[in-house]
């Protein structure tokens, strides 16, 4: 996305930040401090997507491919699909904080609109205020889902939510050696990068059969 390097989280910096946090307890929004899943938990194919809300390839997958996977596989009980955050920069971190502050019933709707409107809420016209302006834009999206300004500010400052998001990134790096987004884990196999619906069809059908 071309953000300044000071926004980027190296793995070591993320680990350092996470080490400073407190254990997750007394959760602000416990219902969404987890990997969010769609589909039958007993489905024969389990897909985990590690994604970044500021990643253009992740937006392409969400906007162009996911609906077909949902219609053809998730809704038919063939695939269980889990979304996990993988924050790449400070804007990402704030966007994920907001996403995990909304009501569980609104999670997937907000996830969808943040990808659909990605170029609207990532505000880059002032290079020295990208984080500030983008966070203010996110506040407006929170309002669409009933998140007041006070609740939004509380969300941005909540250490438990930050803890959870950074932990998810660390686990992705340590367990699956993830270094880019999107990365898909399909029945334990790692597939890095966006894929077409035809590629997903081939992999899923092979796993089912």
Report the location of each language-model feature:
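Extracytoplasmic thiol/disulfide redox context detector
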Residues: 2-91, 139, 143, 165-175, ...
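Cysteine-centric redox/oxidoreductase cores and disulfide-bonded domains
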Residues: 87-180, 185-189, 194-198, 205-208
